[in-house]
């Protein structure tokens, strides 16, 4: 294991050195992330090289790419991953007043800093990260924006194929085994294993948005025609096997239509404060599992936030969320989040705090830490994340994320 890590470190150094030769086109960062899980008493490590490439062929045509090379000992099945996060051709004004991007894209909709209910084109890895909000995976897409004038634009997104969130097979089986085992145990049936079959949609995904700048704020309305990125159980069938009962589980991806409204601008009455908000009205495909509807009626999800920097350099971001990232339908509930960073005068230290509270069961998530900037290009952040609440509470279900986090980042 140590030898493999050393080889990978050498490869990373070679790649970074090669990139520096083409300094005009390449940029990126090298990040180490370590988590010490307090309950399991183990340390996991991730080394991430993110290379960004930009090359202009003409004033109107350029190519851009974002390649991620990641090594992690969290996954023994696939510790080394090479991920082309983005790679696309960008044409600007080749067609008058039209900007077109085509290739593997990350499409960001919504004005919120995190957990926007309008941001639905790109899947994310399993789990919810409170330390890295930029984990989305690229998808094959075309993004065309037509500028009607200096303050109004019309944007259209087209994905020829639906790309769901990826969950490792063994991890997915464990999730559904723990989900359905109690139900069958109550009937006197012991489930020993799970077989999973996915039914993927064969229709494209698309969306359209029109936005406009006003005197003190920007606003946009949008429509998304696509699917839920995470699978829902569709068929559940216990089958006798040679070594016990096997659960044959069919998973599908319900369709959904999302009508959205987003805005960003000055907060009334507080100079320098910014108000952001996203509102989604979601119409799901009715989805029935074992005689009960997992999805049926239309519902709302929303995020509203304010950020402000005080005269003594304290940055505050306060947000209200109705419907967390993992909640859909009648499971949606209210949360409050706060993010605070204090820049100290004549100091390279920056203390920070991230907190969230469920307004339904009052469970809490807290992350207390500090960053140290050795230079403009290199920094280290140490934080401690802990949960307050019962295991069945909203945040109590996330006890596995508790621990110490160390992140070192070098930009080049």
Task: Give the ranges of each region predicted by the language model.
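Repeated loop/turn-to-beta-strand initiation elements of outer-membrane beta-barrel proteins
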Residues: 24-26, 59-64, 97-100, 151-154, ...
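Transmembrane beta-strand segments that form the barrel wall of outer-membrane beta-barrel proteins
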Residues: 28-38, 62-73, 85, 100, ...
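Gram-negative outer-membrane beta-barrel proteins
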Residues: 34-40, 71-75, 108-112, 162-168, ...
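Residues that define the transmembrane beta-barrel architecture of outer-membrane proteins
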Residues: 41-47, 80-85, 136-140, 202-206, ...
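Outer membrane beta-barrel
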Residues: 54-166, 170-174, 212-215, 389
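Outer-membrane beta-barrel strand-turn architecture
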Residues: 55-59, 93-95, 148-150, 213-216, ...
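Detector for outer-membrane/organellar transmembrane beta-barrel domains
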Residues: 224-226, 264-357
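Outer-membrane beta-barrel "beta-signal"
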Residues: 340, 398-412
């Amino acid at each position: 294991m140590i030898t493999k890590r050393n080889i990978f470190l050498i490869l990373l150094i070679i790649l970074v050195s090669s990139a520096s030769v083409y300094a005009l086109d390449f940029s990126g960062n090298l990040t180490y992330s370590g988590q010490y899980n307090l309950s399991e008493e183990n340390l996991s490590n991730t080394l991430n090289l993110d290379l960004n490439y930009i090359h202009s062929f003409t004033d109107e045509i350029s190519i851009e790419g974002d390649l991620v090379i990641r090594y992690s000992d969290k996954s023994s099945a696939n510790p080394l991953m090479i991920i082309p996060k983005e790679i696309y051709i960008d044409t600007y004004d080749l067609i008058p007043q039209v900007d077109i991007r085509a290739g593997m894209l990350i499409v960001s909709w919504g004005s919120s800093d995190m957990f926007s209910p309008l941001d639905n084109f790109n899947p994310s890895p399993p789990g919810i990260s409170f330390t890295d909000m930029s984990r989305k995976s690229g998808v094959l897409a075309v993004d065309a924006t037509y500028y009607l004038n200096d303050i109004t634009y019309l944007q259209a997104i087209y994905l020829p194929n639906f790309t769901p969130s990826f969950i490792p097979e063994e991890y997915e089986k464990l999730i559904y085994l723990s989900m359905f085992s109690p139900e069958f145990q109550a009937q006197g049936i012991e489930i020993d294993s799970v077989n999973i079959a996915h039914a993927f949609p064969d229709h494209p995904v698309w969306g359209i948005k029109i936005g406009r700048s006003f005197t003190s704020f920007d606003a946009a309305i949008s429509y998304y025609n696509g699917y839920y990125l995470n699978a829902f159980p569709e068929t559940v069938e216990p089958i006798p096997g040679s070594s016990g009962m096997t659960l044959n589980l069919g998973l599908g991806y319900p369709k959904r239509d999302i009508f959205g409204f987003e805005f960003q601008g000055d907060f009334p009455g507080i100079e320098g404060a910014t108000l952001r908000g996203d509102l989604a009205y979601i119409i799901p495909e009715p989805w029935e599992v074992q005689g009960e509807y997992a999805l049926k009626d239309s519902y709302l999800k929303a995020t509203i936030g304010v950020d402000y920097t005080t005269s003594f350099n304290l940055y505050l971001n306060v947000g209200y969320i109705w419907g967390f990232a993992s909640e859909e339908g009648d499971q949606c509930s209210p949360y409050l989040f706060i993010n605070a960073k204090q820049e100290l005068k004549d100091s390279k230290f920056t203390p920070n705090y991230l907190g969230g509270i469920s307004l339904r069961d009052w469970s809490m998530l807290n992350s207390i830490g500090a960053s140290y900037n050795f230079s403009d290009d290199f920094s280290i952040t140490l934080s401690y994340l802990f949960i307050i609440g019962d295991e069945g509470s909203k945040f109590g279900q996330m006890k596995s994320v508790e621990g110490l986090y160390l992140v070192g980042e070098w930009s080049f």
